[in-house]
């Protein structure tokens, strides 16, 4: 991935090898690898492709998965993945009741990966949740490993408070927990201004008198609660990493790509430069955006403009077509500020000689000459090389969440959702991936549940390529991916069956 430049600095705490690991390093649990097999998989020369065992391993929806280690840029495969079926059930004690005055305070206990509620078909008081995730680590695998173990727990915890609301799709979510929800068929949730000034309709103080609505209330759909739960879970996961890095060795940071299936809809949450696409009838439907210094230029520049102290008097928030030279002071040069999508000319000043906040193009673009992704988890100790300037204030843990309603379409066995880290997308276009999958799957036995794993393996092989005298090469003798590559192929037809 477009991660950390060599030589970037870490803080004095949270990065020492003397601290214990939060979780031991390993490959995804669902691969079922022994320690010896994990060691053998870390061959940077042969780069064996790991897949699910046909005999013993099966993921939900017959999901396919394959991965391969990098060509030597890091000792370990810094990608991580997890896939689980969980059961969302209201917490004992009534999480949906009116919260007490202390409910907004931070929890005293944090998720530890234990006690996740697995699917239980005998219980009708909750909702089944399907979960897939990919984490692309940089500057170490610590954050990616921790997130792969705990992020699903945070999502589950956020959903537990609202599970009863989500199950009752006929009624809009209440504005305040503990209130009787309004039925949109019988209550518009609005009053005229005159009626609101009179205090509403009905006898004051009467038990049947609804709460006074002074202005129109927003009608919040149920899927927005799920989106909010996922967004909150990402934030809580990042805060947990920040807290625990002082007592555990949680190295580096990671991007995060998560898919949650709940009540007939897929929620695709992305923070970083991994990517998700749906292939339906051969058509590509993008389900994520990449978050890089280029795509988030204006957000980063605006933050630096509003809080210039974050630049440490070493960087300028302005963008120029190239580095400004001292001999150009006083001349008019092209530039871009946070409020601009186009370019204009400005008179070069002394401050413009500072290194630009964002420098480089494409995969070489970096924030403060250090990191190539702008959203993800971790990186709390990341600093500009040989300085005390922290980069974390410019990085966001907030994901973009897109929703795909499976109930709107009838999907065939070759309609799939592809999730992959940037090791795949750096060398293959969306259309190339779609063409490969649509050509591969029809040649497999439609009754073979392993066909999606074989499709994932085929994609990894196409991106890795073959080792030749001039390195790893793919079709048309293009340079293959030397990065870690992880791929899910998720058949959508199983989502229709679940719904």
Language model: regions and residue ranges:
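PP2C/PPM-type serine/threonine phosphatase catalytic core
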Residues: 2-131, 137-499
């Amino acid at each position: 991935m477009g991660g950390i430049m060599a030589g970037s600095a870490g803080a004095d705490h949270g990065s020492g090898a003397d601290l214990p690991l939060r979780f031991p390093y390993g490959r995804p649990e669902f691969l079922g690898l022994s320690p010896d097999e994990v060691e053998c998989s870390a061959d940077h020369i042969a780069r064996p492709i790991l897949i699910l065992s046909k005999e013993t391993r099966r993921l939900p929806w017959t999901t396919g998965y394959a991965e391969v280690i990098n060509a030597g840029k890091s000792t370990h495969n810094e990608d991580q993945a997890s896939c689980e079926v969980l059961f969302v059930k209201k917490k004992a004690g009534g999480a949906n009741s009116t919260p007490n005055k202390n409910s907004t305070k931070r929890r005293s206990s944090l998720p530890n990966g234990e006690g996740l509620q697995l699917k239980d078909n005998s219980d009708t008081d909750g909702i089944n949740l399907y979960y897939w995730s990919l984490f692309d680590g940089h500057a170490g695998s610590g954050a990616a490993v921790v997130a792969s173990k705990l992020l699903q727990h945070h999502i589950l915890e956020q959903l537990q408070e609202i599970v009863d609301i989500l199950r009752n799709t006929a009624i809009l979510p209440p504005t305040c927990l503990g209130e009787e929800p309004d039925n949109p068929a019988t209550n518009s949730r609005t009053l005229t201004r005159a009626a609101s000034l009179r205090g509403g309709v009905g006898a004051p103080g009467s038990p049947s008198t609804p709460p006074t609505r002074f202005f129109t209330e927003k009608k919040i759909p149920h899927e927005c609660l799920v989106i909010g739960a996922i967004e909150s879970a990402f934030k809580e996961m990042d805060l947990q990493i920040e807290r625990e890095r002082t007592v555990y060795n949680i190295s580096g940071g990671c991007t995060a790509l998560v898919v949650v299936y709940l009540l007939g809809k897929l929620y695709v949450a992305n923070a970083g430069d991994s990517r998700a696409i749906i292939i339906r009838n051969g058509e590509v439907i993008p389900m994520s955006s990449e978050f890089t210094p280029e795509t988030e230029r204006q957000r980063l520049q605006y933050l630096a403009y509003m809080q210039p102290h974050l630049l440490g008097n070493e960087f300028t928030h302005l963008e120029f077509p190239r580095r400004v030279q001292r001999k150009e002071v006083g001349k008019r040069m092209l530039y871009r500020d946070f409020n601009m999508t186009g370019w204009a000319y400005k008179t070069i000043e002394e401050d413009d000689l500072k290194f630009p906040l964002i420098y480089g193009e494409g995969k070489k673009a970096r924030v403060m000459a250090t990191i190539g992704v702008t959203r993800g988890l971790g990186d709390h100790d990341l600093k500009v090389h040989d300085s005390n300037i922290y980069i974390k204030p410019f990085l966001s843990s907030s994901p973009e969440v897109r929703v795909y309603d499976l109930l709107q379409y009838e999907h065939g066995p070759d309609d799939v959702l592809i999730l992959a880290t940037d090791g795949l997308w750096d060398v293959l276009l969306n259309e190339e991936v779609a063409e490969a999958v649509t050509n591969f799957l029809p040649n497999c036995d439609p009754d073979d549940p392993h066909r999606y794993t074989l499709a994932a393996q085929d994609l990894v092989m196409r991106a890795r390529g073959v080792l030749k005298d001039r390195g790893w090469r793919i079709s048309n003798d293009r340079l293959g991916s030397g990065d870690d590559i992880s791929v899910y192929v998720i058949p959508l037809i199983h989502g229709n069956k679940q719904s």
